[in-house]
């Protein structure tokens, strides 16, 4: 063994065989392997082994070759019993550097604290030593702060002192949680004042700098303090008294969850003004179908029951991310309790901004349809449990946007416990829901506050259905939707791939059906756009799901060649599919990027036969602008990322629908035309889907 002062031990690293520096995450390992493991867990990395054939997944991991294949190195870490739960996901902020002008204040404070500490320690018995020590240190710190006068000089503090609470946040959270003052609402949106703000109001000193009276968009109330602190992961902190504070204030002064330049208000307003109007029949149907729940909520809800609870979003827990604006689970009693253990925050997860709006009435609906409805209403979009899968979906949370085509009147208004009567889910106790038939027309305008109306289209793009979360969760956890054996492409059979592709097609159609801006178009335009873009949507879902897999052996097998034509055009398309999957694996788009790419592919104004082209073009432009801003802010060092993402879309369109149908769906649907299947799936009621 080495000497006491020597960190290196004679025990070898269990991963690479190098000299270990002690126990890390449960095993003896070197600093290199322990650091690699920590980074991989922190960033939720998914590596792919570049080896082929029998060598795939068997790369040597030793001192010399440990950096050559990260996938095999991470696998070796897990095989060596490294414990990922031992990785600390959160650390406190580093101590801020004191400004030179405040150095003498700090010096006097430290001297006073030391004197008080020694005085307190000398006047207590030994059996009370620990309690007295802590109390004396606390009082000494308070006395030192008062003596030094630091609390009278907030204006003189350096930035590192004022903002040290959020010093450990990553770049994307800083961007998404520091919005400017709210911009004026776009024309065509009907806004009303929302309900009272939950929790104690923060003092003026903690209001966002964007303007007086505007609370920080993601501030939460610390259990032991009266002021608001930034939420590290968008989570909810419950104080000992049992009151939980939501992420953002629901009052009229709440700030936007995204910077105003991300939202492109003019485009939203212009697109909204071009959308078709709402018929009186649809308005009457929606009002009549929702009047009872609204009245019930108004009579039974208390101020404490209107809190919106969000679990901490992250890619590692991506079921509860991306569109926490998303749906209520159709099988709430079967929902997974995923907890809130995420280490990283993405731009797309920092979007919740709930609002409590009054009931709808026929006279209060704006002629121009809005793209969102308020989260305070008891209306909830019904998430279908598709018949092709035994999978369950986890509980989602209070949403900003509710797809009117899949609304249901949630039974949470009549819960036995009387808490959260407007269906505020918690990750530990999902509540069952009862589906009801949708209204005749889904393009329904409703009231919303400034934040929800401005950011509505962005959040609608990010996953109105649970499709995006399910695929991304499968990519990272590989346990929810698809069989565990699919992790190894060598064990992936053709039958498994056929079953999986059928699920992916179903999820793509459900994503379209739950996209509210799409529902505002005419029925003819909806069917035309879906028929034109279904293969792009399916291929994007397939590419995202196959990120950790390699389908090359299956696509090049003789079994596949028998199912497609052997002409030159088909063979070229087969190669194009493999190239798309490979490029997708290299870029690894996040959930927001995939959602925007799907919207760009769906809203294709060049589609022949459209009744109204301009709204479609506006929605496509909006999706492109959101994608551009997201890439620029989320990946500032990847200047070519936006272009590479857009260049994937033309490649998708070069593949004929007949090739996709013959390759992936011939044995599943038989001789049924894909156009008829898509129409049936699209017009299927939620109650039929859940059977």
UniProtKB/Swiss-Prot annotation:
GO cellular component: nucleus
Biased composition (Basic residues): 94-109, 120-133
Tissue: In larvae, pupae and adults, expressed in small subsets of cells in the anterior region of the brain. In pharate adult brains, expressed in around 20 large neurons located close to the antennal lobe and lateral protocerebral neurophils. Also expressed in a small cluster of cells located just below the chemosensory region of the antennal lobe and near the mechanosensory region of the antennal lobe and subesophageal neuropils.
Annotated region (Impairs binding to DNA), positions in chain: 103-162, 172-488
Keywords of this entry: DNA-binding, Metal-binding, Nucleus, Receptor, Transcription, Transcription regulation, Zinc, Zinc-finger
Biased composition (Pro residues): 432-441
Keyword DNA-binding: yes
GO MF terms held by the record: DNA-binding transcription factor activity; DNA-binding transcription repressor activity, RNA polymerase II-specific; nuclear receptor activity; nuclear steroid receptor activity; RNA polymerase II cis-regulatory region sequence-specific DNA binding; zinc ion binding
Gene3D superfamilies from the UniProt entry: Erythroid Transcription Factor GATA-1, subunit A, Retinoid X Receptor
Domain NR LBD positions: 452-685
Region span, Repressive Function 2 (RF2), important for transcriptional repression: 172-265
Residue spans of biased composition, Polar residues class: 363-396
Pfam families in UniProt: Hormone_recep, zf-C4
Localization annotation: Nucleus
Chain residues forming the annotated DNA-binding region: 10-89
Record region (Disordered): 85-151, 176-253, 295-450
Segments for region (AF-2): 674-685
Residue ranges, compositional bias (Low complexity): 110-119, 134-149, 214-245, 295-327, 352-361, 406-431
InterPro entries: NHR-like_dom_sf (IPR035500), Nucl_hrmn_rcpt_lig-bd (IPR000536), Nuclear_hormone_rcpt_NR2 (IPR050274), Nuclear_hrmn_rcpt (IPR001723), Znf_hrmn_rcpt (IPR001628), Znf_NHR/GATA (IPR013088)
Biological role stated in the UniProt entry: Orphan receptor that binds DNA as a monomer to hormone response elements (HRE) containing an extended core motif half-site sequence 5'-AAGTCA-3'. Acts as a transcriptional repressor. In both females and males, functions downstream of tra2 to regulate the development and function of certain sex-specific abdominal neurons, and likely regulates the development and/or function of the nervous system that controls courtship behaviors involved in the recognition and response of adults to appropriate sexual partners.
PANTHER family: NUCLEAR HORMONE RECEPTOR
Family to which this protein belongs: Belongs to the nuclear hormone receptor family. NR2 subfamily.
Protein's name according to its UniProt entry: Protein dissatisfaction
């Amino acid at each position: 063994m080495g000497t006491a002062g020597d960190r290196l031990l004679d025990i070898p690293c269990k991963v690479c065989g190098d000299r270990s520096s002690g126990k890390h995450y449960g095993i003896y390992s070197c600093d290199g392997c322990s650091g690699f493991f920590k980074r991989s867990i922190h960033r939720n990395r998914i590596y792919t082994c570049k080896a082929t054939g029998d060598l795939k997944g068997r790369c040597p991991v030793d001192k010399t070759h440990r950096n050559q294949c990260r996938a095999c190195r991470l696998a070796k870490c897990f095989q060596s019993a490294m414990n990922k739960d031992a990785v600390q996901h959160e650390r406190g902020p580093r101590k801020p550097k004191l400004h030179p002008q405040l150095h003498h204040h700090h010096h006097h404070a430290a001297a006073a604290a030391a004197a008080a500490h020694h005085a307190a320690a000398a006047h207590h018995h030994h059996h009370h030593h620990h309690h007295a020590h802590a109390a004396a240190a606390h009082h000494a710190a308070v006395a030192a702060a008062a003596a030094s006068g630091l609390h009278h000089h907030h204006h003189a503090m350096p930035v590192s002192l004022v903002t040290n609470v959020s010093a450990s946040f990553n770049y994307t959270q800083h961007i998404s949680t520091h919005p400017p003052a709210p911009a004026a609402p776009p024309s065509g949106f009907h806004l009303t004042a929302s309900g009272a703000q939950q929790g104690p109001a923060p003092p003026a000193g903690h209001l966002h700098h964007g303007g007086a009276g505007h609370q920080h968009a993601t501030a939460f109330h610390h259990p032991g303090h009266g002021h608001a602190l930034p939420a590290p992961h968008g989570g909810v902190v419950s104080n000992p008294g049992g009151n939980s504070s939501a992420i953002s204030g629901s009052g009229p002064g709440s700030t936007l969850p995204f910077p105003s330049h991300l939202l492109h208000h003019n485009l939203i307003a212009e697109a909204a003004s071009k959308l078709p109007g709402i018929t009186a029949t649809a308005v009457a149907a929606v009002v009549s179908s929702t009047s009872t729940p609204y009245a019930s909520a108004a009579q039974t809800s208390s101020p404490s029951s209107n809190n919106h609870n969000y679990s901490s979003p992250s890619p590692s827990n991506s079921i509860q991310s991306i569109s926490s604006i998303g749906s209520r689970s159709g099988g709430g009693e079967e929902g997974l309790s995923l907890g809130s253990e995420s280490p990283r925050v993405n731009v797309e997860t920092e979007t919740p901004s709930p609002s409590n709006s009054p009931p709808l009435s026929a006279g209060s609906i704006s002629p121009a349809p809005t793209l969102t409805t308020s989260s305070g209403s008891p209306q909830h979009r019904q998430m279908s449990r598709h018949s092709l899968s035994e999978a369950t979906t986890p509980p989602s949370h209070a949403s900003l946007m509710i797809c009117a085509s899949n609304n249901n009147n949630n039974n949470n208004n009549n819960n036995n416990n009387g808490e959260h009567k407007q269906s505020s889910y918690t990750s530990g106790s999902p509540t069952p829901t009862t589906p009801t038939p949708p209204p005749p027309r889904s393009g329904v305008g409703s009231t919303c506050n400034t934040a929800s109306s401005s950011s509505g289209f962005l959040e609608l793009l990010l996953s109105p259905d649970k499709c995006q979360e399910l695929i991304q969760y499968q990519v990272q956890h590989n346990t929810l939707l698809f069989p565990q054996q699919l992790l190894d492409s060598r064990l992936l059979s053709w039958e498994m791939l056929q079953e999986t592709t059928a699920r992916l097609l179903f999820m793509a159609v459900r994503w379209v059906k739950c996209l509210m801006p799409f529902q505002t178009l005419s029925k003819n335009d909806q069917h035309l756009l879906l028929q034109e873009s279904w293969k792009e949507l399916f291929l994007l879902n397939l590419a995202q799901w196959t990120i950790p897999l390699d389908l090359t052996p299956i696509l090049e097998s003789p079994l596949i060649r028998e199912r497609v034509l052997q002409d030159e055009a088909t063979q070229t398309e087969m190669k194009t599919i493999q190239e798309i999957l490979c490029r997708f694996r290299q870029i690894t788009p996040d959930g927001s990027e995939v959602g925007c790419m799907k919207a760009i592919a769906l809203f294709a104004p060049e589609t022949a036969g459209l009744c109204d082209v301009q709204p479609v073009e506006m929605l496509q432009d909006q999706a492109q602008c959101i994608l551009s801003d997201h890439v620029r802010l989320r990946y500032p060092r990847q200047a070519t990322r936006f272009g590479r993402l857009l260049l994937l879309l033309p490649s998708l369109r070069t593949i004929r629908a007949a090739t996709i149908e013959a390759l992936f769906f011939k044995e599943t649907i038989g001789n049924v035309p894909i156009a008829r299947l898509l129409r049936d799936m699209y017009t299927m009621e939620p109650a039929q889907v859940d059977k």
